[in-house]
A protein has these predicted regions:
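Nucleic-acid substrate recognition interfaces
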Residues: 1-477
């Protein structure tokens, strides 16, 4: 599942777009019975690969023609409002009773193309040309020594087929039957395909509460799949005063899946804990060890890499679900993460591979999507020093002071650390409390109350103790 969010107006809420990828089981040899509005199925067979390939190549050639026409008429399009670009290009290439096309070759070459497919091709071609023009304009502004290779207009080698409202038949979706209009080399006709009953029931159920958008056909590892897209609108927390929020501060870790704490603006920590997903973590470690065994034996390990990737993905899914479960139980208004860009060289010795596989951005994206559906907001703070500094203000922590011996060697427990005052504490849990403190300190600064606190670099050295010992500033109340 992949989610794409688009912010709307306050009246309409936030638009959340979700994609579900469903595999096609087989192709149906069927004809539509208009009297009973059912399919007369005479047989089942493998998906016709040549049919899909011909349709994709046909549309790809149409995109190539449209991009050439748009490039030639780019100066003309600059005088047209952007909202009318699609209709303007349609008039340039398609002749009607009231319009004579400037490029009649399109109708001759693609005379059987449906109108909705033509509009899809025009939209894709406009996006390609517009991106090329913007990249080329940026390239020209650079100095000759910094330019590099000149941007080119590239047509993708593969074209994903998108089916709009007019050309998809989803009325039989509850029965697991979908209809797609495809090109067989001579004409466009309806072809029907079968998906699993469980997938069909799930899509039919979520389609009652969400708007179905245009599905897309894609081929992954030799199998055809349909990507169904849905849109829904959700109202988020409308309170603009963030000092009234109850937040869930999250520190995503490597030793543990995540550490969290629930906090309010007066510095009170209502709940805290560490998420340990032992089943998923053990599965991932086992797959990593299996991969090493394959590499040491000189065996082909392509399948093992896929196992590791899938185990890692399942770990991120379980982490996101656990965080959302805690947020729902605690009834928080906002979930606060660290801003993790992941740039720079990765250090860490034996943990280097785990850092490479750290799906921090994937977990944050999944939590963001699920939180928005529940009306919660998402915020991020500066990550520097959250784990390095103790939440009680005692200074930097020591992560090499907690260890035990195995086979005569020291084995450090990096989940625990020692504060300067001698206290042994969970390092990630301390970081989670610092993350929550930085969120509220930032809001205090925006409210004009930072004069109540010590003058330290706000984005790097702030810890929980900074505003706990000072109390709730009256200026911010």
């Amino acid at each position: 599942m992949k989610d794409d969010k688009k912010k709307g107006s306050k009246d309409n809420g936030m638009s959340i777009k979700t994609c579900y990828v469903i595999g096609i089981q087989c192709q149906l040899d069927a004809k539509e019975n208009k009297k009973t509005n059912t399919l007369d199925i005479s047989g089942r067979r493998k998906v016709d690969d040549s049919l899909m390939r011909q349709t994709a190549e046909y549309c790809r050639e149409a995109v190539r023609f449209c991009t050439s026409a748009i490039l030639s008429e780019w100066d003309f399009l600059q005088s047209v409002p952007k909202k009318l670009w699609r209709s303007a290009v349609d008039k340039l290439i398609h002749t009607t009773a009231g319009n004579k096309a400037r490029y009649p070759e399109f109708d001759k070459k693609f005379k059987t193309m449906p109108g909705y497919t033509r509009r899809m091709v025009i939209a894709d071609a406009l996006g390609m040309v517009r991106s090329y023009k913007e990249n080329h304009a940026k390239w020209e502004t650079l100095k000759p020594a910094e330019r590099g290779a000149e941007p080119t207009l590239g047509i993708p080698p593969r074209y994903e087929l998108t089916f709009y409202d007019q050309e998809r038949r989803m009325s039989r979706l509850s029965k697991g039957q979908i209809g797609l209009k495809l090109y067989d080399g001579k004409k466009w006709d309806w072809y029907y395909f079968q998906i699993s009953a469980s997938d069909a029931a799930y899509l039919a159920r979520i389609g009652k509460s969400r708007k179905m958008l245009s599905p897309t056909v894609q081929k992954i590892r030799g199998r055809y799949e349909v990507r169904f897209c849905f849109e829904e609108r959700k109202e988020l927390v409308q309170n603009d005063r963030k000092l009234d929020y109850k937040i869930l501060a999250v520190d995503l870790g490597i030793n543990a899946a995540a550490s969290w704490c629930v906090m309010t603006a007066d510095g009170t920590v209502h709940a805290k804990g560490v998420i340990h997903l032992t089943c998923e973590e053990d599965r991932l470690n086992r797959m990593i060890n299996r991969k090493r065994q394959y590499q040491q034996a000189g065996k082909k390990s392509s399948c093992v890499y896929r196992w590791v990737k899938e185990a890692n993905r399942q770990l991120s899914i379980a982490t996101a679900k656990a965080l959302i479960s805690i947020a729902s139980e605690q009834k928080v208004d906002c979930i606060v993460f660290e801003h993790l860009d992941g740039k720079g060289k990765i250090h860490g010795g034996r943990y280097r591979e785990r850092i490479h596989m750290w799906r921090k951005n994937d977990v944050q994206a999944r939590v963001t999507d699920m939180a928005h559906r529940l009306g919660m907001r998402i915020s991020r703070v500066c990550a520097w020093g959250t784990s390095k500094l103790a939440f009680d203000g005692s200074g930097q922590v020591d992560r090499h002071s907690v260890y035990h011996f195995e086979h005569g060697k020291k084995v450090y427990n990096y989940s625990l650390c020692r504060f300067q005052n001698g206290k042994i504490y969970n390092c990630d849990l301390s970081a989670a409390q610092n993350i929550g403190a930085r969120f509220f300190l930032r809001e205090y600064e925006r409210a004009g109350a930072m004069g109540m606190f010590p003058g330290t670099p706000q984005r790097t050295l702030n810890t929980l103790i900074m505003f706990v010992k000072n109390g709730l500033p009256e200026k911010a109340v």
